[in-house]
């Protein structure tokens, strides 16, 4: 495109000519304990051939979801992931925080958290994931990287609501696959319903609990087969 990469610094203004045939693209960043969030740039086209833009600090980023007011308990977690480009809404102005999270939606969030380029992932082993489905490249990315194995050798159940124990398994595998160290600082807890946790999910649940990624329900249970809501998923991923 003729332009060089630029290292932006706070407090420094940069001017670059942009014609109407050109465009600028926001490349989302990741907000976690070890990676600093990138800046978001707004591009305002003027009447002439020049354009102006400014760096917007994370706190200034417009938050569009009217169903997630600042008073809602999950607001800071949802906003953190939204600012980082990890999550999007069900519509332009709603997030549906209390709705159940589907398996396809969750792997999409994991890909966003990783900052993965899923454009090359177009085919997969799951017969219930059409190649032209919006979630197909995300599911394929997750499968090829060992984050998910599916509900069977050939099925993923993308539209099914994800259970809390399956969420734990995906997050645990995600951490393993991408070298995310899970701490062990939190004392181990035996959930009141530990016996209800499937054998395949128990190691993941225990590891995430010791890492402080999950803490269970207020009554001391984990409710492994209960569905995870969209806001609960944001709380989990913001802890990574």
Regions found by a protein language model. Name each.
Residues 9-12:
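A glycine-anchored, Pro-Gly-centered beta-turn/N-cap motif
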Residues 22-51, 142, 208:
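Structured interaction patches on ligand/partner-binding surfaces of diverse proteins
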Residues 46-75, 88-107, 111-138, 144-168, ...:
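Feature responds to low-complexity, polar/acidic, surface-exposed segments characteristic
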Residues 79-84:
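Mature N-terminal segment immediately following signal peptide/propeptide cleavage
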């Amino acid at each position: 495109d003729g332009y060089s990469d630029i290292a932006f610094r706070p407090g420094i203004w940069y001017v670059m000519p942009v014609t109407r045939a050109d465009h600028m693209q926001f490349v989302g960043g990741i907000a976690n304990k070890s990676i600093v969030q990138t800046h978001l740039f707004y591009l305002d086209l003027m009447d002439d051939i020049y354009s102006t833009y400014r760096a917007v600090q994370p706190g200034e980023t417009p938050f569009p979801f009217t169903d997630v007011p600042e008073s809602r308990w999950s607001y800071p977690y949802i906003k953190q992931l939204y600012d980082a480009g990890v999550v999007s809404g069900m519509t332009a102005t709603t997030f549906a925080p209390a709705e159940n999270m589907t398996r396809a939606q969750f792997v999409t969030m994991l890909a966003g958290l990783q900052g993965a380029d899923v454009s090359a992932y177009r085919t997969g082993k799951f017969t219930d994931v059409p190649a032209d489905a919006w979630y197909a490249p995300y599911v394929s990315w997750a499968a090829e990287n060992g984050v998910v194995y599916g509900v069977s050798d050939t099925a993923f159940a993308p539209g099914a609501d994800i259970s809390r124990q399956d969420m734990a398994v995906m997050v645990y595998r995600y951490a393993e696959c991408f070298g995310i160290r899970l701490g062990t600082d939190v004392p181990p807890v035996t959930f009141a319903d530990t016996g209800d946790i499937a054998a395949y999910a128990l190691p993941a649940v225990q590891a995430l609990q010791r890492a402080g990624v999950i803490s269970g329900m207020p009554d001391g249970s984990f409710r492994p087969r209960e569905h995870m809501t969209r806001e609960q998923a944001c709380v989990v991923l913001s802890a990574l």
